[in-house]
Amino acid sequence: MNKAFVKSELFLIKNDKLLAPVIKKNGHLTFSNKKTDPFNELIEIVISQFISTKAAKAIKQNILSRFKEDNFKIKSFEKLSISQIKNLGLSNNKAKSISDIIAWSDLKPSKNYIFELSRDEREKELLSIFGIGQWSVDMFEMFCVRNANIFSSGDAALRQAMLELGMVKKEANLSSYDNYSKKWNPYKTQACLHLWHMIES
């Protein structure tokens, strides 16, 4: 057994015989509990919608290079029209979504406001933004709020990994994926990290 595995990974290895070999092959994957900047995270999530990880990374790097920034900041976008945002290499809907994120952010008392809400309140807030659906909310909860117990059945890569491992049947509906993920509670996010790593490796 790899001594570097943390409590969450040891729990998953013990409780899921199908996931255990994946974790052992992957080795330890770090999940930081440090919250990230909400605006930057929302922009990254919007860019990542409906495209591969590789394509999303390339678009992010290209936009950040144009802005000469390391992270997405409101000041870089706030004076841009939807058309100008689209010209950064994004679809019209993603440009509209980013524009709406800026408008939404401007109305909040502070960037940490979103962390002060309950999970349900936060979800309601985020779903009010154009272009933000349940998958985006799940990704925000994982990678911005750093919630350790999130699974997103709306994520195609996670479904692919679970199907390949025989966790669900080919004709399974989304609730079947959600039901299977219950055995990972309270470490669903760590399980997702390993499934994504499996697909990307």
How would you name each of these model-derived features?
Residues M1-T30, A95-K96, D100, S118-R119, ...:
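C-terminal accessory module of base-excision DNA glycosylases/AP lyases that mediates lesion recognition
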Residues L18-A20, K25, S52, A56-S128, ...:
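Alpha-helical ds-nucleic-acid-binding substructure associated with the helix-hairpin-helix region
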Residues T30-S32, K124:
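Short, solvent-exposed helix-loop connector elements
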Residues K35-N40, F77:
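Short, flexible turn/loop "capping" segments at secondary-structure junctions
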Residues P38, L42-I43, A55-I59, K94-S97, ...:
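Residue-level detector of well-ordered alpha-helical segments, enriched
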Residues L42, V46, F50:
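Short, aromatic/basic-rich helix-turn unit that serves as a nucleic-acid recognition element
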Residues I47, K68, I82, A103-S110, ...:
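A broad detector of the eukaryotic-type serine/threonine protein kinase catalytic domain
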